[in-house]
């Protein structure tokens, strides 16, 4: 029994991720070896990449030269030099065709793998961004918005309480203002009544003054009349006395003459009696005049005293009314000043309340606007997150589709390789291995993003 072996191995290794400071990076290698042995054939397909290097090695079972071993093996299998040359020519053509086909497949796989790696890297970056976004912003945004909402609700509650308190104070001030207004109206009505009473008393005072002046005039007139009557009475008495004296003188003369010429009654005695009668009559008249004068004077004096008393009473009432009027005027002025001050305080309070309400409303509007802005930003963040998730799902679906395409390419490659192997000589065996991996370069650190290997092996053997 004799065995001859020829082994061909092709390997493609590519790394697209990884780098370092020492000039490392990805590496790609492509090696090819052929193996001929007695036995069956097999093929295995894996992944390929874009960058490659090709190397070939041939080994014989005993470690001699490759060509001699190949020639000896071929000649032994075909039974002569001509058959061996034909077999070698067919094998070379088959290997060249396989090499060209595998190179084309390698390029196609490399493009697919590059796209898959790009999509995987992009998907990984998006997943990392999504995780970072979720871990960083989502809880913080939620807590931030919840805290802001709690603060805003607390502020709104506080503003509502302040507004209610201010409304209560405003209502109290309005009630006090209404009370003071009612009091002012009552005092104004009382003032009007007092002013009317004062006007009436002024009229009565004027009437009393006029009556007093009239009485004084009457008293003066009566006094003048009394004086005039007294003077007239005195003049009449004086005239009567003069007449009486003249009469007495004449009677005395006549009586003397008569006594001289003829004796008769005593005229002196008669004259004395007449004088006594006239004196008595004058006394009675004087007494009557004095009585009338005194009576009239007493009546006028009493009337004057009554008028003076009425005048004093009126003056006292006027003084009292003036004092009451001054007190009421002062109280009215005080109430007016107090009412004016209260109206000013009420207006100032209403203005301050209106200003505070406007400030609170502006703050509420700002907070609501900020809340709407934050809600809009949150909605935008959620929309962006949703778009990222949709992109991730689309990339996952695209990756799955490329994976299915790769699996289909593997199946197709496996079928084509199997058909190519069936066309080769039964004494030859070929093994092709494609591997794609990513790793770190020489000096720098790197990270491996994945490994995908396609191995195609075909073996056929013959033992003697």
Swiss-Prot record:
Signal peptide (from-to): none
Residue ranges, compositional bias (Low complexity): 45-59, 420-438, 449-464
Region of interest: Coil 2: 265-413
SUPFAM superfamilies given in the database record: Intermediate filament protein, coiled coil region, Myosin rod fragments
Biological processes annotated in GO: intermediate filament organization
Residue span of region Coil 1B: 145-237
Linker 1: region residues: 134-144
Region named Tail: 414-464
Protein family: Belongs to the intermediate filament family.
Record bears the keyword Nucleus: no
Cell location: Cytoplasm
Origin species: Branchiostoma lanceolatum
Pfam families documented for this protein: Filament
Extent of Polar residues compositional bias: 1-14
Name of protein: Non-neuronal cytoplasmic intermediate filament protein
Biased composition (Gly residues): 17-27, 439-448
MF-aspect GO terms: structural constituent of cytoskeleton
Keywords, sorted A to Z: Coiled coil, Cytoplasm, Intermediate filament
SMART domains, A to Z: Filament
Annotated region (Disordered), positions in chain: 1-59, 415-464
Region (Linker 2): 238-264
């Amino acid at each position: 029994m004799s065995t001859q072996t020829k082994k061909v191995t092709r390997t493609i290794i590519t790394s697209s991720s990884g780098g370092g400071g020492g000039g490392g990076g990805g590496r790609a290698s492509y090696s090819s070896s052929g193996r001929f042995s007695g036995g069956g054939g097999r093929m295995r397909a894996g992944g390929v990449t874009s960058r490659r290097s090709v190397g070939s090695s041939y080994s014989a079972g005993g470690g001699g030269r490759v060509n001699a071993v190949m020639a000896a093996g071929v000649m032994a299998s075909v039974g002569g030099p001509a058959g061996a040359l034909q077999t070698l020519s067919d094998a070379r053509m088959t290997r060249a065709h396989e090499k060209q086909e595998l190179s084309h497949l390698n390029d196609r796989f490399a493009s697919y793998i590059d796209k898959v790696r790009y999509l995987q890297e992009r998907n990984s970056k998006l997943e990392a961004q999504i995780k970072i976004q979720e871990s960083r912003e989502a809880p913080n945004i939620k807590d931030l918005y919840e805290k802001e909402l709690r603060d805003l609700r607390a502020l709104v509650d506080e503003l509502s309480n302040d507004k209610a308190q201010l409304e209560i104070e405003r209502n109290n001030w309005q009630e006090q203002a209404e009370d003071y207004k009612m009091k002012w109206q009552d005092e104004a009505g009382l003032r009007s009544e007092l002013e009317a009473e004062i006007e009436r008393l002024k009229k009565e005072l004027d009437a009393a003054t006029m009556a007093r002046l009239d009485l004084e005039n009457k008293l003066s007139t009566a006094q003048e009349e009394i004086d005039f009557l007294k003077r007239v009475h005195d003049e009449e008495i004086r005239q009567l006395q003069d007449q009486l004296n003249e009469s007495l003188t004449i009677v005395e003369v006549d009586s003397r003459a008569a006594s001289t010429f003829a004796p008769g009654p005593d005229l002196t005695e008669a004259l004395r009696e007449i004088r006594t009668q006239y004196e008595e009559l004058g006394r009675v008249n004087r007494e009557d005049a004095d009585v009338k004068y005194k009576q009239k004077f007493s009546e006028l004096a009493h009337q004057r005293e009554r008028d003076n008393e009425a005048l004093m009473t009126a003056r006292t009432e006027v003084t009292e009314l003036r004092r009451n009027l001054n007190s009421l005027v002062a109280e009215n002025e005080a109430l007016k000043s107090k009412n004016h001050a209260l109206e000013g305080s009420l207006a100032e309070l209403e203005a301050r309340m209106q200003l505070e309400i406007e400030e609170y409303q502006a703050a509420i509007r700002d907070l609501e606007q900020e809340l709407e802005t934050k809600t809009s930003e949150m909605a935008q963040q959620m929309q962006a997150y949703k778009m990222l998730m949709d992109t991730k799902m689309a990339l996952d679906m695209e990756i799955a589709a490329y994976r299915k395409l790769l699996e289909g390419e593997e199946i197709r490659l496996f079928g084509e390789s199997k058909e190519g192997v069936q066309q080769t000589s039964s004494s030859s065996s070929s093994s092709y291995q494609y591997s794609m991996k990513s790793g770190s370069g020489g000096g720098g650190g790197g990270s491996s993003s994945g490994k995908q290997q396609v191995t195609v092996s075909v073996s056929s053997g013959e033992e003697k």
